[in-house]
Amino acid sequence: MSSAGIPIQKKKNAYSAVKVDPNDDYATPGAFELERLFWKGSAKYTHVNEVWPGIYIGDETARDKATLQRLKITHILNSAHGKFNINTGANYYKDMLIHYYGIEAFDSPDFNLSVFFYSAAKFIRAGLNTPKLLVHCAMGRSRSATLVLAYLMIYKNMTVVDAIQEVIQRRCILPNRGFLKQLRTLDIQLAIERSNRRNGIKNNGEEKEAY
């Protein structure tokens, strides 16, 4: 209560757990709960790790063409594109059979990486037809990891918890808190879509087209 005797309304925690479907046991965790998941990872930090069949997460080792050839990398998604980051680009790999996609992202909690979630996920999915694909940034822990987590959520029907638990078994990652909040928002959006599809089956006896 304020000094004037007016009740003070407590602000809601925008990052508490959110349950979209009351018939589903799953609830999207709050941001702090998501951070705690990374403490359970056992993988040691190395330059490059295969975190999903055909998908590698790495650091600035992406400049090392010999390593790329040894790993038989055919596609590169650079989430630290640009002259102030890991400035490679398609021309850097012109002597190699590599498809390149660059995103000029910054490892800042205020940077909106979510606008690239779907375009990056589509590039990853297309790259796996070859494969192999490297997603990298400067350290291979935040930007690149966030995009791989988003891919697993969008195309492999994983929750954000499932995706994190899958990747931390194989690589030491830690997206910044802003990116975690963006993944959390994606998780809620995808949960709503799944709930809508389930309701479509229940109500009409047939599955509606996915949104």
Swiss-Prot record:
InterPro entries in the cross-refs: Atypical_DUSP_subfamA, Dual-sp_phosphatase_cat-dom, Prot-tyrosine_phosphatase-like, Tyr_Pase_AS, Tyr_Pase_dom, TYR_PHOSPHATASE_DUAL_dom
Compartment(s): Cytoplasm; Nucleus
Enzyme Commission number(s) of this protein: 3.1.3.16, 3.1.3.48
One record GO biological process: negative regulation of MAPK cascade
Catalytic activity: O-phospho-L-tyrosyl-[protein] + H2O = L-tyrosyl-[protein] + phosphate; O-phospho-L-seryl-[protein] + H2O = L-seryl-[protein] + phosphate; O-phospho-L-threonyl-[protein] + H2O = L-threonyl-[protein] + phosphate
Residue ranges constituting the Tyrosine-protein phosphatase domain according to the UniProt record: 47-192
PROSITE patterns given in the database record: TYR_PHOSPHATASE_1, TYR_PHOSPHATASE_2, TYR_PHOSPHATASE_DUAL
Main location: cytoplasm
GO cellular-component term (any): cytoplasm
SMART domains tied to this protein: DSPc
Keyword terms: Cytoplasm, Hydrolase, Nucleus, Protein phosphatase
A family per Pfam: DSPc
Domain of life assignment: Eukaryota
Function: Dual specificity phosphatase able to dephosphorylate phosphotyrosine, phosphoserine and phosphothreonine residues within the same substrate, with a preference for phosphotyrosine as a substrate. Involved in the modulation of AMPK and MAPK1/2 signaling pathways.
Family membership noted in the UniProt record: Belongs to the protein-tyrosine phosphatase family. Non-receptor class dual specificity subfamily.
UniProt protein name: Dual specificity phosphatase 29
Species in which this protein is naturally found: Callorhinchus milii
